[in-house]
Design a protein with these regions (language model features):
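Residue-level hotspots at or immediately adjacent to binding/recognition sites across diverse folds
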Residues: 27
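Short loop/turn segments immediately following beta-strands, especially the blade-tip
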Residues: 87-95
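Short, solvent-exposed loop/turn segments at conserved positions within beta-propeller repeat blades
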Residues: 30-41, 79-82, 149-150
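Short coil turn/linker residues within repeat-based beta-strand modules
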Residues: 48-51, 81, 91, 151, ...
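Beta-rich, blade/repeat-based domains predominating
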Residues: 6-24, 40-42, 55-73, 104-144, ...
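C-terminal closing repeat unit and adjoining cap/tail of repeat-based domains
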Residues: 148-174
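Beta-propeller fold detector
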Residues: 1-4, 53-57, 95-105, 165-168
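Conserved blade-register residue in beta-propeller folds
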Residues: 45, 86-88, 154-156
């Protein structure tokens, strides 16, 4: 699968998930290395023939993503919003019915991160450990394992936000 995505985003692309039919959903940073401001950005759909389009917009650094085994739901980690957001996958592979699947970051922290790019700086200054999603993995019980680089852990979270398991890591978890 090859596709030029530069007409859809000017930011560096990052994690991607591919469904059983070969359709890819690709996230991006929503910022550049030289830009302090973080802006909402998009999740890009790439069809097997390479045709790309915007699948969802106004996401805060769409990062790790999973597709449920039935192929009907996509869940993406929004790193800068500290949440997992779900979408229904329609038969034409478009996304609809956006919902917050689990909120990890308190709203007040989210507004601070709109001003400051690095969440670790917020945590350092506030003394508050801010969980954010990076890479994610869906388990057989429909829980999501989340790598959180800001808290040096991988944790399991259920829909609605209940954290059921935590594994501390000696280094940042991505």
């Amino acid at each position: 699968l090859h596709s030029d995505l530069s007409h859809l985003t000017k930011y560096t692309c990052n994690d991607m998930v591919v469904d059983k039919d070969g359709h890819a959903y690709v996230g991006n940073f929503g910022t550049t290395k030289h830009n302090i401001d973080v802006v909402p950005t998009c999740l890009i759909h790439v069809a097997p023939d390479g045709v790309a389009s915007i699948a969802a917009d106004k996401l805060e650094f769409p990062n790790g993503a999973v597709i449920t085994p039935d192929g009907k739901k996509l869940i993406v980690g929004e790193t800068y919003a500290g949440r997992l957001t779900s979408f229904d996958i329609n038969s034409d592979k478009t996304l609809s019915n956006r919902k917050i699947w689990a909120q990890m970051m308190p709203t007040w922290i989210f507004y601070i991160t709109k001003i400051r790019r690095f969440l670790k700086q917020v945590a350092k200054e506030s003394g508050y450990a801010v969980r954010v999603p990076d890479g994610i993995c869906l388990d057989e019980a429909m829980g999501i394992w989340v790598a959180s680089p800001t808290t040096f852990e991988v944790f399991r979270i259920e829909e609605g936000g209940l954290v059921t398991d935590i594994v501390s890591t000696p280094q940042r978890a991505y």
